[in-house]
């Protein structure tokens, strides 16, 4: 059983604070943290909290700097960074968590110019926000091209997608959707449950998945 969020907007916290929180949670959970991050999108929530979201360009410029800072603090003894949004000098993050070289970093989103490019460089896990298999396959290929540009094997990155169990509780549809995405290289299907999150759906959903033969481990 893993622990994490899918995903936290990076603008809510300084990446140094987030790195320390991540290390602490990785320790407390016994090395089960999945660090899910994104550039941020929720204008209503950001406005309610009085946190500046910024333009799309600003969000992604800040996000890319954040990824560099996070990776440094999670893997290095000290980190020095001089960016537009963040400046660190001989910064430490100790103790680090048990997962080495760092907890898996998951980046969510499908933007081809910035999100997938940043994913190729910094992520261990990419989350596709959901859509038909053809769209997933196209985004997968864009991600692979970005990986090729920097000499990275795209197989190093886990591929996941959202699936939704509707109020009608059509378990067979969830399984069919997962199978269609699996044929295009999906590694992990993440099922969103209908509100009010009735736990009684879990057993029939698990049975449908188990009976489908889709489980690999």
Predicted feature locations:
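Active-site-adjacent structural elements that line small-molecule/cofactor binding pockets in enzymes
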Residues: 1-217
């Amino acid at each position: 059983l893993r622990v994490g969020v899918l995903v936290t907007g990076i603008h809510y916290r300084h990446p140094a604070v987030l790195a320390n929180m991540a290390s602490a949670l990785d320790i407390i959970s016994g090395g089960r943290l999945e660090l899910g991050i994104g550039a941020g999108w929720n204008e209503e929530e950001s406005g309610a909290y009085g946190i500046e979201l910024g333009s799309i360009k600003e969000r992604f410029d800040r996000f890319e700097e954040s990824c560099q800072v996070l990776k440094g603090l999670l893997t290095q003894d000290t980190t020095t960074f001089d960016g537009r949004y963040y400046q660190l000098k001989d910064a430490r993050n100790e103790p680090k968590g048990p997962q080495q070289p760092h907890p898996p970093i998951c980046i969510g989103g499908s933007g081809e110019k910035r999100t997938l490019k940043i994913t190729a460089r910094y992520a261990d896990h990419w989350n596709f926000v959901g859509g038909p298999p053809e769209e997933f396959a196209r985004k997968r290929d864009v991600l692979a091209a970005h990986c090729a540009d920097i000499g990275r094997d795209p197989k190093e990155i886990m591929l996941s997608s959202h699936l939704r169990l509707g109020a009608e509780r059509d378990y067979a549809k969830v399984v069919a959707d997962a199978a269609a995405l699996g044929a295009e290289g999906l590694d992990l299907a993440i099922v969103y449950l209908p509100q009010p999150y009735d736990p009684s759906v879990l057993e029939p959903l698990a049975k449908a998945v188990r009976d489908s033969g889709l489980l690999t481990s």
